């Protein structure tokens, strides 16, 4: 086996261990779906999940989800710089997602009802930041930058201000 093939295989093992869907792992590594399914079963002891990936507008559908996604996107921008608007870079995605998880663990109680963004949704957002399907918007009231989708399901406006208003 060539060094490049070993590297792609090791990357696939890491990404599957992190919970990335096989369609994404295949896209990133170029490995055949059958190889990835076999690898997934060997690593996880079960068949891989199936079904479509979420859309960015679905990920941003509620104010809380939009706020959580915005925290991830800000972490991703911090690790990837301005280049995230041109292309998705795997190291920046993984580093940004790890930072996001650290922040969530530090500030949200374990029994919190708020759903933590999973890595597949994070990948969708990173991909869509590169294509312009999602973008940052700065709030005119609190100055926080939050994530919006061009095809939005969530109401317009800042999710942080909306959540603060709701909790008063």
Give the ranges of each region predicted by the language model.
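Long, charge-rich, low-complexity intrinsically disordered regions
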Residues: 1-14, 18, 22-168
């Amino acid at each position: 086996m060539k060094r490049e093939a070993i590297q792609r295989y090791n990357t696939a093992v890491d990404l599957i261990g992190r919970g990335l869907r096989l369609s994404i792992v295949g896209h990133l590594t170029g490995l055949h779906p059958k190889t990835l399914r076999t690898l997934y079963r060997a690593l996880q002891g079960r068949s891989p999940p199936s079904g479509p990936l979420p859309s960015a507008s679905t990920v941003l559908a509620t104010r809380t989800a939009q706020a959580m996604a915005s925290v991830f996107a800000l972490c991703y921008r911090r690790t990837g710089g301005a280049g995230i608007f041109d292309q998705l870079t795997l190291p920046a995605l993984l580093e940004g997602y790890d930072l996001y998880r650290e922040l969530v663990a530090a500030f949200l109680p374990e029994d919190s009802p708020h759903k933590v963004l999973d890595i597949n949704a994070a990948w969708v957002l990173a991909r869509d930041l590169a294509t312009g399907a999602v973008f940052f918007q700065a709030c005119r009231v609190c100055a926080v930058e939050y994530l919006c989708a061009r095809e939005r399901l969530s109401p317009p406006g800042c999710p942080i201000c909306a959540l603060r208003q709701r909790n008063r």
